Amino acid sequence: MNDSQTISSLQSICVYCGSGPGKDPAYLKTAHAFGRILAQSRIGLVYGGGSLGLMGEIARSVLDHGGHVTGIIPGFLSEREHMLIEAQELIVVDDMHQRKQLMFIKSDAFVALPGGLGTLEEFVEQLTWSQLGRHAKPIVLLNIEGFWDPLLVLFDRMGAEGFIRPGLELNMLVVDRVEDIIPTIDKALGAYPAVSEAQVEAEVSTKF
């Protein structure tokens, strides 16, 4: 990091991504790059606690570059996904609900890299919570090599067919380059003053 690079005010980012590497080498390369960027920006990683695939790649990259990693994993996945025991903070919980709750509490923003059904479910859940006024934390979709293009088309179709109503648009930021993630989140945080959960809920209630 050069002397002119600004340190983000973000404390931690939750990253959703696959427990496999995917077929395109760009996925692992990008996960590694984002881990380096997080560490150099002094932003902690909150993630699913595994050591395999994109999950393991980003976590090890954060550690290799002197950053902090918080892994949160249910006990029944601790062997299947091979916990990353090198993480500074490794929390074993009872179930997926506790995992997602803690990941939410410990994070200032959310980023989704390529992944499978688990990644998609976690990402969409944050979009839903935001749409329902449960939080206003930035949610970023990293669209590596157009991986998420079909999902974006589906979201557009939902809007066109009236299932995502005007005023309840998805609170989602889409970026194509890993180096744009943190500036995009910082810009989003700076554009909106801090509001209470009650204020967010009151605004959303007028849309139904």
List the predicted regions and their residue ranges:
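Active-site/ligand-binding-proximal alpha/beta "capping" segment
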Residues: 98-133, 140, 191-199
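Arginine/glycine-rich "motif VI" loop of SF2 helicases in the C-terminal RecA-like domain
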Residues: 63, 129-137, 163-165
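A cross-family phosphate/adenosyl-ligand binding-site feature
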Residues: 2-106, 146-179, 188-208
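Short acidic/polar capping segments at secondary-structure boundaries
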Residues: 116-118, 132, 145-147, 178-180
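Short loop-to-beta-strand entry elements in the cores of soluble alpha/beta enzymes
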Residues: 136-145, 174
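Hydrophobic "lid"/C-terminal helical patch
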Residues: 185
